[in-house]
């Protein structure tokens, strides 16, 4: 997937699946809303949620975003998360972007305003996942791993480097 396509894909209200680690090392997955800022994924949660406690204990995580419409694609990213908490960090502007993306666009202002007002009553924090590994596949052109690498190389003008 090209960078512009990836940004457009991640701007849509697709639900992501976040993987965290349990204390014993087993993965724990949970559906999440996220906001991609071009460098990192922002995810909101509450201190009471299991996955939030896991990230506060061990910041390693993976986020998978898969969709079949309007564009069939997949984005996966792995990396450490950093917790951002009140009062040191104002979590509300990013939280408002999440509400706009997932509530306001599909359901309108009244639903979004009510949802956001409820969020502000909860003991919330934000996590910022800055990927150290990133995968993006556009299923419209995907014909297997090798063909995908060749397509990406043609699009970026580096075909000779990817023919290995």
Give short role names for the model-derived ranges.
Residues 73-164:
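Charged, gly/pro-rich active-site loop segments
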């Amino acid at each position: 997937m090209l960078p512009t396509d990836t940004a457009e894909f991640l701007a849509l209200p697709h639900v992501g699946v976040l993987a965290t680690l349990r204390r014993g090392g087993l993965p724990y997955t949970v559906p999440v809303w996220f906001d991609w800022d071009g460098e990192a994924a922002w995810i909101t949660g509450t201190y009471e949620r299991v996955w939030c406690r896991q990230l506060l204990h061990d910041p390693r995580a993976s986020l998978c975003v898969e969709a079949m419409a309007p564009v069939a694609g997949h984005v996966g990213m792995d990396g450490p998360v950093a917790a951002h908490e009140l009062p040191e960090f104002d979590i509300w502007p990013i939280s408002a972007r999440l509400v706009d993306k997932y509530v306001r666009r599909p359901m309108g202002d009244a639903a979004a305003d009510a949802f956001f007002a409820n969020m502000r009553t909860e003991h919330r924090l934000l996590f910022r996942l800055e990927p150290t590994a990133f995968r993006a596949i556009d299923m419209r052109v995907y014909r297997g791993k090798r063909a995908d690498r060749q397509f990406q190389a043609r699009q970026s003008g580096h075909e000779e480097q990817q023919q290995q």
